[in-house]
């Protein structure tokens, strides 16, 4: 319930503030002031990941990746699906991270938390979780910023207001210019968390990390505050909430006029024929 989640958030925030090596993160700011990053065109990459390899992904994920690629091509972007066979082509990940992944001290989801910020730091571009459905009309320019995400604060309903993000961002859709300060600081934060905790303080470590940086560093606070509002909690999760409903063309058109990016889930216990989930899997949306 809301009260216990708020209390839990408070305890985790206190733990993170007390244990994070802030001087390591401050070094990123010193490096940043010494590095003149040339402002060029926004990097045209859409990054995502399926660790076991795309060919081994569930059907739904293969379909969402199909839509991500289609969207990327329309906008002149290259899609890169990171997996265990190609990661070394793009990143040098510290050995202790792999060792913790093998031991199971961190799972693939939290490993991918680190990977998205390393990619944005090194190359820039857009990160989308592999279960994201992107409608062709999604306004990509809201992500072509120094650092961006989906700010979904305009939702009037009170659900999930106990969430640490306070609707300022979503971890499954992030973007940034190459070398952006938020990704660099988050990379430093996550490496510190992975190295110095037997178990990460929370599954949603990205949200606690961004919240921590927001509180501690004015520069990051200002960047996050400048992310334009787009969509609502209800709309972003609409496809997941309605996955078993029978597809209705008028309803879908109404929904995609309001919002054009959706979090879906491949974890459906059964597929209802002609449902939204079924349409997504069959690439008929």
Where are these regions (language model features)?
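Small-residue hinge/turn detector
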Residues: 113-123
């Amino acid at each position: 319930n809301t009260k216990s989640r708020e209390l839990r958030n408070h305890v985790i925030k206190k733990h993170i503030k007390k244990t994070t090596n802030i001087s390591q993160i401050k070094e990123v700011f010193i490096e940043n002031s010494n590095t003149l990053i040339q402002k060029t065109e926004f990097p045209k990459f859409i990054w995502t990941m399926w660790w076991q390899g795309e060919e081994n992904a569930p059907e739904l994920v293969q379909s969402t990746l199909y839509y991500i690629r289609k969207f990327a091509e329309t906008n002149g972007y290259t899609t890169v699906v990171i997996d265990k066979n190609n990661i070394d082509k793009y990143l040098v990940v510290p050995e202790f991270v792999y060792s913790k992944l093998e031991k199971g001290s961190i799972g693939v989801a939290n490993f991918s938390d680190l990977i998205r910020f390393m990619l944005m730091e090194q190359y820039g571009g857009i990160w989308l979780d592999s279960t994201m459905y992107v409608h062709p009309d999604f306004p990509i320019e809201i992500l072509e910023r120094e650092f961006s995400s989906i700010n979904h604060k305009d939702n009037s309903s009170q659900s999930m207001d106990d969430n640490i993000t306070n609707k300022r961002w979503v971890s499954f859709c992030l973007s940034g210019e190459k070398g952006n300060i938020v990704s660099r600081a988050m990379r430093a934060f996550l490496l510190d968390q992975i190295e110095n905790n037997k178990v990460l303080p929370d599954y949603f470590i990205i949200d606690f990390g961004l919240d921590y940086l927001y509180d501690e560093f004015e520069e990051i606070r200002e960047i996050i505050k400048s992310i334009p509002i787009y969509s609502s909690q209800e709309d972003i999760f609409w496809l997941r909430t309605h996955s078993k409903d029978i597809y209705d063309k008028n309803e879908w058109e109404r929904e995609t006029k309001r919002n054009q990016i959706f979090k879906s889930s491949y974890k459906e216990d059964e597929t209802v024929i002609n449902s939204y989930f079924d349409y997504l899997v069959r690439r008929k949306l």
